[in-house]
Design a protein with these regions (language model features):
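Short hydrophobic transmembrane-like helices used for membrane targeting/insertion
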Residues: 1, 11-20
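Activation targets extended, charge/polar-rich intrinsically disordered C-terminal tails
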Residues: 16, 21-54, 58, 181-248
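Alpha-helical transmembrane signal-anchor/signal-peptide segments
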Residues: 52-69, 75
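Glycine-rich catalytic cores of cysteine/serine-nucleophile enzymes that process amide/ester linkages
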Residues: 72-164
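Internal catalytic-core helix/loop-beta-alpha segment
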Residues: 162-182
């Protein structure tokens, strides 16, 4: 006859039960601590949000000629910065080495620049593609960022939902510098992501900053406004915090 050589076989049953209860109690205690930290983190996030949300960074006044138009566009919960492809300030085709990509439709005159979670961009072309795993990683992780560039035209925009800005040469150059620095570069070339499920009108680049709930797509747009000396918020994880600054 074979006997079990395990530890519990030599311990009375009531002792085994007590040890199991102790293990369960320790496990529940650890789970409770995790949940407490989780809810404390969420509470802290919204406390900081409500503290900073009302404050506005005012537009810096200037006597310079305001010759460049910049448009902020809402895209669902997301925001983009719309700029002309060609201007006296920059030729984006040459600057990002995408002249061939832009030949897909020469009637389109502008580019939409947006920042976001790289995995979310590439895995979620449509909201129907969103999975719980992708959503969880986006909300609770610190993930690689990406810059989405979309070929488009202002004539297709709903003008009732946009913010139109006028920038000087100096302010425009600061915004351009910000956008270019938001892209990761290797050997003087932007790191373009060629394997994506979008159309020929869409381009993606690796971003120089990681994405998290502390630095979202709307935080990126808001930083662009700050850099170019426009009215902005202190922290804007949600698009409403940007657009509320421009309500009449």
């Amino acid at each position: 006859m074979q006997y079990c050589n395990c530890r519990f076989s030599r311990i009375p049953i009531f002792v085994q039960i007590q040890e199991m209860k102790l293990l369960v109690k320790k496990l529940l205690l650890r789970v409770g601590i995790v949940f407490e930290l989780f809810f404390a983190l969420i509470a802290s996030y919204f406390i900081i949000f409500f503290v900073l949300a009302p404050f506005t960074i005012d537009k810096r006044t200037t006597t310079e000629t305001l010759r460049h138009e910049v448009i902020i566009i809402p895209e669902g919960i997301h925001t983009d910065i719309l700029l002309p492809i060609h201007s006296t300030a920059i030729d984006w085709g040459k600057a990002l080495f995408i002249e061939k990509d832009l030949q897909v439709d020469t009637f389109q005159t502008h580019l939409k620049f947006g920042y976001g979670d790289k995995n979310f961009f590439l895995q979620t072309k449509n909201w129907s593609d969103l999975t719980s795993k992708t959503l969880f990683r986006t909300i609770f992780g610190i993930n690689e960022g990406a810059i989405h560039v979309n070929l488009c035209s202002p004539r297709d925009l709903d003008t009732s939902k946009i913010i139109k800005l006028k920038l000087s040469d100096r302010q425009m150059n600061k915004l351009i510098h910000f956008i270019k620095n938001s892209i990761k570069w290797s050997n003087n070339f932007p790191e373009q992501i060629t394997n994506h499920p979008y159309s020929q009108y869409d381009l993606f680049f690796n971003a120089s900053k990681d994405y998290s709930v502390a630095y979202t797509c709307n935080c990126w747009t808001n930083e662009g406004l700050q850099v170019s000396e426009q009215k902005a918020g202190y922290w804007t994880p949600f698009k409403e915090l940007i657009f509320s600054k421009y309500e009449p």
